[in-house]
């Protein structure tokens, strides 16, 4: 995992992510920090291995009072020449063998920005005996 807090790096990552969608907005919702989960794509279960890392960051952030959100499209971001150049610039080893799994944005929610949890669905979990 690599975390980026400089405004320039964060803004570059945001623009790359928006470009994947064909837009120019801020898919990172103004969050000041982005942690990118990267995995070794030569390992057959690399995506499955990397996804819990993003999920754990989401849970850890909430536990210390931060807000966090998983932002998809990391795979597409780092398949580009720009993505590969960034990894090399940042000194990430074996950049050519890495695949993006997810972007975890971190920050503090705006006042009133946190929604109440959705009501739990009844009979959603089925216990098989």
PLM features per residue range, with description:
Residues 1-129:
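Acidic, surface-exposed loops and disordered segments
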